[in-house]
Structures are given as C-alpha cells and as structure tokens.
C-alpha cells in the first residue's frame, strides 16, 4: 500500500513537471580543466573509428599553399603594420565530440596567427561588454559612449554597435595608417578595392578590417583597458586556456589611456600582428560557443547575445556578429543550418555544429571546410 502510494506520488510529480514543461536534467556537460582535455576512443561515443580516421586523412591531405615563412604576406594583403612569426605550423587540428577529444592531427600546440578568427573573438568581448552593461543596447550609437573623434562626422555619428558587429557600419576614415576605402595596391595588396561611395550605416555589408579595427578601439574605450586584458580575464582564464596565446598590436596602434600608452588590437592579421594562438585554445573558444556562451556553470557571454550573434544580418552573406552562419546552406553546403564557423585566412577554421555536439579546429588548410565537417559527421552513428 505504501509502495503503491509512493509510486502514485512519483507519477503525479512527473506529470506535474511535464505539464510545467520541465524534464529530468540532462547529464552535465564535460568541461576540460586547465592544462588537460579528456580523450575518448571514437567507439566509446558511438563513432565509427575508421570513418573518422578517413575524415582526418582528408584534412591532412589538404595543406595550404600559403608560404610557410609568410613571405607572401605583403603581396597578398599590403604593407605591414605589425610583426609576423618567422614561420607557421603545417596543417593541424582537433575534433571534439560531446566534449571529448576524439581526433588530433599535426602540431596542435604550435602558436601562430589565426587571422580573422580573431573577429569572432572580438564579438565575444562585445558580448562581455553587454553583460557588464558597458554597452547598453546594441542599437545605440557608438558615439554615445565613445568620444575620441572617430564618430564625429555626419557619416560616422549614427553608427551602432550592431552595425559594427555585422560589418555594416560604413565607417569612413583612416586608422593606423590604413583608409577604410581599401584603395591602393601598396596599402592593400591583392585585396585592394575600387572606389565606392559609402552608403548610410546599416545599409550595406562590406568585409573591412579597417572598420573592425575601429570597432576594437571602441571596445577598448568602453572597457577602459586593452581588449587582450579583457579577453584574458573574462574569457580565456575562465575557459582554462593556456598562457601561450597573445594578441599582438600593430607597431603604431597605441592610444593614450589614463596618461599611459596602451595597445589597441586588430580583428585579423591582414597587416601583421593579430591573434597568435594554438589549436587547443581555439578548440576551447569554440566549445564555449557550442555551450551557448557558458562554461561549467558560468555564463561568460549572455545567452541572448549568443542567440542574436548566430542570427543572420539583413545584408550581404550569411553573417551574424562576426561569425559565419549557414542558415541559407551556402557557407557550409550539406551541413546543418545551425552550424557556424570562425574563418580566417590561411585557412584557419573553428567549425561548430550544435546539432551534432561537435567542434572542429582545422588550421593551415586549403581544403573544403564543409567537406571535412560532413566526413566527420558521417562517422557519427
């Protein structure tokens, strides 16, 4: 009688929870502690080991043609403003499935530039600014909080934080010796562009590192400290990253702050400098975003911001807040619409597929990101 009553009570509670939209808690996600990351054999997680090995073999067979010593840097991007390493790693990467490392190839500990993957890191810093109230609403004008002359003109005054994040700011001017118009072979190399009359902020998408660097400087202003310090304290230390990464400024990208000269960093390595990092720390960063901006119970990036960041903007390609999206199925053909990626020249890639609980880091490759992703996914049984 007692057993039946207890059973009835249990069923009643279960029904009540179900009616309230509540369910039994999912197993807690694994978060790697600093300095280590648990590995599991593919078969332990229901993966086909042979298929995964074949996917990795595909990745290893697609080494980039970029010069190992960066001797092609200026011809490709224009005159340098910052330093570069003497060499880069060969193609390498990691596959993280359900939180565990199931594959590793190449020299994943080598620290070198990750180019425009740094843009997605700037987006993360902006998310921290939102969390801390340093940015009120993303649709407010940057000029409301940043008064350094960069938004004084009629063209630049209306620019919002969201427009910077979506690369639709149409900011005009020069910064660190580079003009936002990208005109000139010497300054911009093979990436030079034809003159174009700028539109109103928010009306046009253009992938533009000068404008992103202006955005990075604006983040420095609202935090009152260099962006790398914020990124280390609020992101990288929280996720247990190593101390080997560094965000290298240009030689001339210093501003006065509280009577001191402090560095402002870039959102890429087009003109040298930028984020220098290894594959393990890139994987931790990707895993943070796979987990919705949370790490082991701590919400590093607001969940609402993450959702917005992975929503496509009105203009241009499938692009969110400095993340490449796949909602139209064109960025990563054949992969889920929910997949997204941080992409940098080289090529350097962090690929995230929430539908498959998957993070892939693939560096210094000349292959098809979606093809590698699909081959890994095909190994999931």
Predicted regions, residues:
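Active-site-proximal loop and beta-strand segments within enzyme catalytic domains
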Residues: 38-40, 60, 64-85, 114, ...
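Active-site Gly/Thr loop motif
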Residues: 243, 248, 254-269, 310-359
């Amino acid at each position: 009688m007692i057993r039946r009553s207890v059973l009835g009570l249990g069923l009643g509670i279960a029904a009540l929870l179900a009616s309230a939209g509540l369910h039994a808690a999912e197993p807690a996600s694994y978060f790697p502690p600093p300095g280590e990351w648990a590995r599991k054999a593919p078969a332990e997680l229901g993966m086909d080991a042979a298929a995964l090995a074949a996917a990795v073999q595909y990745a290893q067979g697609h080494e980039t043609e970029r010069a190992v010593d960066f001797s092609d840097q200026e011809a490709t991007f224009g005159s340098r403003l910052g330093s570069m390493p003497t060499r880069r790693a060969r193609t390498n990467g990691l596959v993280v499935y359900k939180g565990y490392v199931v594959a590793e190839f190449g020299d994943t500990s080598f620290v070198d530039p990750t180019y425009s993957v740094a843009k997605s890191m700037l987006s993360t810093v902006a998310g921290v600014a939102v969390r801390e109230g340093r940015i009120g609403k993303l649709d407010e004008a940057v000029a409301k909080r940043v008064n350094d002359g960069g938004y004084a003109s009629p063209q630049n005054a209306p620019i919002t934080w969201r427009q910077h994040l979506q690369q639709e700011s149409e900011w005009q001017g020069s910064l660190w010796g580079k003009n936002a118009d990208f005109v000139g072979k010497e300054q911009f190399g093979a990436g030079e562009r034809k003159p174009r009359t700028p539109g109103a902020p928010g009306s046009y998408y253009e992938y533009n590192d000068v404008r992103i660097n202006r955005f990075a400087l604006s983040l420095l202003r609202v935090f009152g400290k260099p962006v790398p310090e914020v990124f280390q304290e609020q992101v990288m230390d929280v996720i247990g990253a190593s101390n080997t990464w560094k965000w290298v400024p240009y030689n001339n990208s210093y501003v006065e702050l509280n009577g001191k000269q402090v560095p402002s960093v870039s959102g890429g390595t087009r003109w040298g400098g930028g984020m220098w990092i290894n594959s393990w720390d890139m994987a931790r960063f990707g895993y943070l975003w796979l987990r919705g901006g949370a790490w082991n119970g701590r919400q590093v990036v607001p969940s609402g911001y993450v959702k917005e960041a992975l929503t496509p903007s009105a203009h241009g390609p499938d692009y969110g807040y400095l993340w490449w999206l796949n909602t139209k199925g064109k960025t990563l053909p054949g992969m889920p619409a929910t997949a997204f990626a941080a992409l940098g020249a080289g090529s350097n890639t962090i690929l995230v597929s929430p539908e498959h609980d998957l993070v892939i880091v693939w560096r210094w490759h000349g292959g098809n990101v979606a093809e590698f992703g699909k081959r890994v996914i095909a190994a999931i049984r």
